[in-house]
A protein has these predicted regions:
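NAD(P)+-binding Rossmann beta1-loop-alpha1 motif at the extreme N-terminus of oxidoreductases
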Residues: 3-70
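Phosphate-coordination loops involved in phosphoryl transfer and adenosine-cofactor binding
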Residues: 15-18, 102, 144
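Amphipathic, non-transmembrane alpha-helical scaffold segments
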Residues: 48, 186-189, 193, 263, ...
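Rossmann-like NAD(P)(H) cofactor-binding subdomain of soluble oxidoreductases
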Residues: 48, 52, 56, 60-139
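Internal alpha-helical scaffold of NAD(P)-dependent oxidoreductase catalytic cores
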Residues: 54-61, 119-122, 139-226
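Predominantly flavin-linked oxidoreductase catalytic cores and closely associated redox partners
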Residues: 131-139, 153, 206, 231, ...
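Interdomain hinge/lid region at the active-site interface
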Residues: 219-274
């Protein structure tokens, strides 16, 4: 993948310090993004949800923000409209909203290309992708979080960059192809890793062992992988080509054929890199 260095942490002089934001969606990302935008000095003028009560509940915690009860025209004017909705909902929402001419509309999806906006030539499309996992009750370190930007033109790009730089020191311009590759990598690093930890927890529970036993190992694994190329510091029976141990492990997984197959496939993947 092509290099994409982080951009300087400053706001372009021609972009207002305080932008007005219209927000569609009230899920985990949206619920954490809205307070961050307010803290950065922006105005979230409205939030919309398919469930009006959800929008009203979120708006009640955001000073100066109202719940938008309907998508009927006219849309309240805003500098940026952010679509914090599931990927599959972006295109239908784009088609359903009566956008003001020239509106800057950005989705927050990692795998959705900028081309999704081609069906709406009256809007200026963009991408405002926060690379992080969001969970209720867990605070986000916004300044350290990568924010990935793409836009259909220089004016839209400048505005989204200004918005991103007001939140994060890790702002990057990525093409749709780069962002898709990043999203795939993030699934391996986050979602698959978490699933493997879940399997490990379940196996320990079956043996009457506490999950805390693995905590030091998990911390060391992650710290080492961040400090060195992960393939270079790979350890374990697959690297050693320890056939008896590999066979014993697969036999121990006989009651879990899906995990047994996963173990064999991961072993093969590790050995293919040797």
């Amino acid at each position: 993948m092509a290099s994409c260095p982080a951009l300087p942490f400053n706001m372009p002089a021609h972009i207002p310090d305080s932008l007005t934001i219209g927000r569609f969606g009230t899920g985990r990302v949206a619920s954490q993004l809205a307070p961050a935008l307010l803290a950065a000095g922006h105005q979230v003028i409205f939030v919309w949800s398919r469930t009006p009560a959800t929008a009203e509940a979120l708006a009640a915690h955001l000073p100066g923000t109202r719940a938008l009860p309907t998508l009927a025209p006219p849309q309240p004017p805003a500098d940026v409209y952010l679509l914090a909705v599931p990927d599959a909902a972006v295109a239908p929402l784009l088609a359903a909203v009566p956008w003001p001419a020239g509106a800057l509309v950005a989705h927050l999806a990692g795998a959705l290309p900028l081309a999704v906006f081609e069906s709406q030539p009256a809007v200026r499309g963009g991408v405002f992708y926060p690379l992080q996992t969001f969970s209720p009750g867990r605070a986000i370190d916004w300044p350290a979080m990568p924010l990935c930007i793409e836009a259909a033109g220089p004016a839209a790009e400048a505005t989204l960059l200004a918005l991103a730089r007001s939140l994060s020191r890790q702002v990057r311009l990525l093409s749709s192809a780069q962002r898709l590759q990043l999203h795939v990598a993030a699934v391996f690093a986050n979602n698959f890793t978490n699933h493997l930890l879940g399997i490990a927890d379940a196996l320990l529970a079956e043996a009457g062992l506490p999950a805390e036993l693995l905590a030091p190992l998990v911390r060391e694994t992650v710290q080492k992988a961040l400090a060195h190329p992960p393939f270079v510091v790979q350890t374990g029976p697959a690297v050693r080509r320890d056939a008896p141990t590999l066979a014993a492990h697969e036999a121990a997984l006989a009651a879990h054929p899906v995990w047994q197959d996963l173990y064999a496939r991961l072993t093969a993947s590790i050995q293919a890199r040797l």
